[in-house]
Amino acid sequence: MVNSDIITVGIGDCAIARSPMKIKTSGLGSCLGITLYDRQKKIGGLLHTMLPNIKDAKLKDNPAKFTDAGIEYLVDEMIRRGGSIDKLEAKVVGGAGMFENSRLNIGERNIKSARETMKKLGVSIIAEDVGKNYGRTVIFDTLTGDLLIKTILKGDKLI
């Protein structure tokens, strides 16, 4: 969905925008919100992933659902639209453990997958707000590269 200056990204989706646009996603529990930003070109992308690895999936039709494949897809799209791989900065938010006693540990596995994939691609993660047990909404500012994290009970934070 596009508002005059904010693009909203749903679960298993991503968007890329140039300054001064903002990109927003909500409902980050065990899911991850991952931003990539090229500070020189003022281009940024936001990805909302659900699951850690595409290799474990029966349906592989949407790479943005998966942390590993989604990051690779977003990096490729950022480069295709003028970003430089050596200039990309990443921020990672979410990966909460929303349910006690969950043996699936989706949040933890998403965080691990993001870190491993970024390392493999040579992209630096410059900030994180991950884990814990609460949901988050993020608003990414492509003018500054700032990421506003909103929570219901924990307040707002800028990374």
From Swiss-Prot:
Instruction: State the EC number(s).
Output: 3.5.1.44
List the GO molecular function terms.
protein-glutamine glutaminase activity
Biological process, per Gene Ontology: chemotaxis
Q: Does the keyword Hydrolase apply?
A: yes
| Reactions mediated catalytically | L-glutaminyl-[protein] + H2O = L-glutamyl-[protein] + NH4(+)
> Any idea which UniProt keywords this protein has?
Chemotaxis, Hydrolase
Record-linked PANTHER family = CHEMORECEPTOR GLUTAMINE DEAMIDASE CHED-RELATED
HAMAP family associated with the record: CheD
Q: Which family does it belong to?
A: Belongs to the CheD family.
Q: What is this protein called?
A: Probable chemoreceptor glutamine deamidase CheD 2
Q: What is the lineage of its organism?
A: Archaea, Methanobacteriati, Methanobacteriota, Stenosarchaea group, Methanomicrobia
Q: Which gene encodes it?
A: cheD2
